[in-house]
Amino acid sequence: MKIVLFGPNGMIGSCIATELSDRGHEVVGVSRSSGADITDPAQVASAVEGADVVVCAISNRGAGYTLADVARSLLDGLRRAGAQRLLVVGGAASLEVPGGGRLLDTPDFPEEWKGEAAQGAEALDVYRSVDDLDWTYVSPAAFIHPGERTGAYRLGGDQLIIDDSGNSEISAEDYAIAIADLVDSGEHLRERVGVAW
């Protein structure tokens, strides 16, 4: 399949690019450094023309736009290009924690991450309002980091996945396996899924 990947150079995006390429997919990377403006639906449409699947793994740190802006632009661009399938590297902060509420709203959630985390939750709301495209919002564990590719992960829904010790963790490499498996299977359309060990 032809996969257009926005954000192929970051920690997560580079792992996704490697995993998809290793599976024989044609991966076309689109990044800010190449001059692409993900907030311009016309540029998005041009970039995703002919794609079987679009994956968005961008970070908006210091970019001057919100993740909800990106969501609206991506969706508009996909519609213009006639592309149907979108997977989004989401955030964990909007996941529900044991006892109720979102991870973002817990007392221990780091203050310096709240702005970006709230943007991720707003973007998820944008995706959830869409019923004409096949999107999947993939929330990682609370802690995602470079590490070992074990091939093991668990999929969940709107609840934060924790292990028997109360930890929520995944390597970027295993998260990329989950993304690639979702690309290959075509499952979990118009849903948010969580991924953790």
Regions found by a protein language model. Give the residues of each.
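Conserved Rossmann-fold NAD(P)-dependent oxidoreductase catalytic core, especially the SDR/UDP-sugar
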Residues: 33, 73-116, 125-129
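Conserved beta-loop-beta element that borders a ligand/cofactor-binding pocket
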Residues: 125-146
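Conserved glycine-rich Rossmann-like NAD(P)H-binding loop of the short-chain dehydrogenase/reductase
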Residues: 26-32
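Glycine/proline-rich active-site loop of Rossmann-fold NAD(P)-dependent oxidoreductases
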Residues: 130-131, 145-153, 182-191
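Substrate-positioning beta->alpha
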Residues: 119, 168-180, 191
